Structure formats: structure tokens, C-alpha cells
């Protein structure tokens, strides 16, 4: 059996080169505030992979994505070991674009903090009088740069995203920036409407895109997982304060309340975290993992 070594290790994912494709493995690691925590969250990698698969299938009519298969039988023998089953995705190789495409439709988190000070989120003027967790009149696109592990992503304007892309792809900066913005908002609208019908509010999320061998923009990375999105229960939604969530916010809140934890979570926080991830998956897909 041929051994495979990851060519890249991210905060949560490991990427393996499979010749004309890549194999992306979502581990059970969890990160918060750009730090990888000491604990593993059992089944988390499977939730991330299977939820991405669900959304990639759901949005294929809008634009192509990089997913080829999540069935390990389609992958080399090395990936047919138990630790890869359910949390591995074989993907097309793309030239990734250096922008994190963030879309927000509810005011929360760093956006709420910024709005309280300036009335703006990432430089975008918002209506006066919004309360925490209010729905915005329209989704807003707030791109950021992609940071290396240990660094923080930097929020940038749409105009700045044109510059960043133009530098790397001369003659295509505006074309790619426009496509990223328009695809991001279209994907969000389609998926947020579906999620609402299943009892989940998608407050905000992040997409990443790449180019295929013909220069087409293709959706890559993960899609609408509890790691890349804020999911709130529709039942009990009430603006004016922060909302309960199905995502990492629970971990972030615990870490903020326990600054001396040295990023070491107690077991009950881990158990509650995976329960929230699984509940979100089951609500959205109607399936159990």
C-alpha cells in the first residue's frame, strides 16, 4: 500500500496530493481565535465533510465546485483505513484565489462591535438604530485577505480585493473580484432560504474560490459548515442580544470566560460542541450521522 503524507496541514484540514486530484481530510481538531486547541472533537471532521458535500450538491446548478467524491472506495487504498472514512473528500485541483469571501446578513460578532463604534461594518455604512443580531436589509459582502496559520485575516474593501487579485492575475482583477462578490451573495441567498425552511438562520458565512485549468471560477474549500458559518436556531430568534448557536461560538464564549484555560477545553464543552454540530447537520439534511 502506498503511503501518503500531507502536502499541506491547515488548522483543521490535511491535504494530500493524489496526482490529478487532491484529497482533503477534515480532522477532529478545533481552532478558535486563530489558535488550534489542545482537544479533539470526535466526529467533527465527518460533520464538516458531509455538510460540505450536502451544500456542494445543493448549489451545483449555480456554479461548479471542486468536489469529486466523498466515498473512500474512489480513493487510493491508503484512504480506505477507518480514520479516513466519512471525513475525506477527493477534489479537483484549483489555483486558489487569495480572498476569503465573507457574507453577512445579520449583525453580530466583530461586525456588531464595529457598528457600535462607527455605524459601519468593514467600511460599509449600515442603517441607524440596528440592534445586536438584527437582520440587515440585504446581505453585505465583506472580503478579507487569507492569513497564514498564526496570523489574523485582514478585512478589506471590495475595491482593495480588485487590487489584490490584479496583482496576482494581471488583467483579471476586476473580473474575478466581481465574480467572487456576485457568487458569494447568490450562494448565500439560495442556501439561507433553504436553511430557514429547516429552522436555521445562517447569520454569516465564508466561501473560498479557485480557478480551474480553463480559468473558470470554481467553489473550493468547505461550504456552510459550523466552522465557516454562524448558524442560529430560528425558534426563539430575538434581536437585542447574542443568539444561541450551532457552531464554534460556544467554544469562543467559553474561552473568553476562561482566559486562563490555556486553550484546553473541559470534556463537557467538547460534548456540547459536537452535539451542536450534529444537530445542525441533522436539521439541515434530514439525515443522521
Describe the residue ranges of each PLM region:
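Conserved metal-phosphate-binding beta-hairpin within the catalytic cores
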Residues: 103, 202-223
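Surface-exposed helix-capping loop/turn segments at secondary-structure junctions
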Residues: 60-66, 190-202, 215, 285-289
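Intrinsically disordered, low-complexity acidic/polar segments
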Residues: 33, 112, 214, 228-230
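Anionic ligand-binding catalytic core segments
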Residues: 117-120, 125-175, 219, 223-284
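A long amphipathic alpha-helix within ATP-dependent nucleotide-binding catalytic cores
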Residues: 169-203
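Coil-to-beta-strand transition motifs
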Residues: 21, 96-98, 198-202, 214-217
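Active-site loop/lid in soluble adenylation, ligation, and acyl-transfer enzymes
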Residues: 1-148, 261-289
